[in-house]
Amino acid sequence: MIFEKVRDIIAEQLGIDPEEITMESSFIDDLGADSLDIVELIMALEEEFDIEIPDEDAEKIKTVGDVVEYLSNLE
């Protein structure tokens, strides 16, 4: 499932427990990410899913659910 894969990438990138990550988690407010973390996270997602996320789309991604929805719409 996409959520589990995304959750594991986020946990690894941010060095946090995967159990803390929910679909509603905000990268900045809930998970403590800064703008550099988000750039690195987008790059990790692009590599893992073999896609390219345009900057205008990346700027709209604020929560874990946003990532899952974005990736689901690509399939």
From Swiss-Prot:
Keywords assigned by UniProt, alphabetized: Cytoplasm, Fatty acid biosynthesis, Fatty acid metabolism, Lipid biosynthesis, Lipid metabolism, Phosphopantetheine, Phosphoprotein
Sequence ranges assigned to domain Carrier in this UniProt record: 1-75
Subcellular location: Cytoplasm
PROSITE patterns xrefs: CARRIER (PS50075), PHOSPHOPANTETHEINE (PS00012)
Pfam families attached to this UniProt entry: PP-binding
Cited SUPFAM superfamilies: ACP-like
Post-translational modification note: 4'-phosphopantetheine is transferred from CoA to a specific serine of apo-ACP by AcpS. This modification is essential for activity because fatty acids are bound in thioester linkage to the sulfhydryl of the prosthetic group.
One GO term of the biological process aspect: lipid A biosynthetic process
Gene3D superfamilies: ACP-like
Position of the signal peptide: none
Any one GO cellular component localisation term in the record: membrane
Modified residues (O-(pantetheine 4'-phosphoryl)serine): 35
InterPro entries given in the database record: ACP, ACP-like_sf, PKS_PP-bd, PP-bd_ACP, Ppantetheine_attach_site
Pathway linked to the protein: Lipid metabolism; fatty acid biosynthesis
One GO molecular-function entry: phosphopantetheine binding
Record family assignment: Belongs to the acyl carrier protein (ACP) family.
Function: Carrier of the growing fatty acid chain in fatty acid biosynthesis.
UniProt name for this protein: Acyl carrier protein
Species assigned in the record: Thermoanaerobacter pseudethanolicus (strain ATCC 33223 / 39E) (Clostridium thermohydrosulfuricum)
Gene: acpP
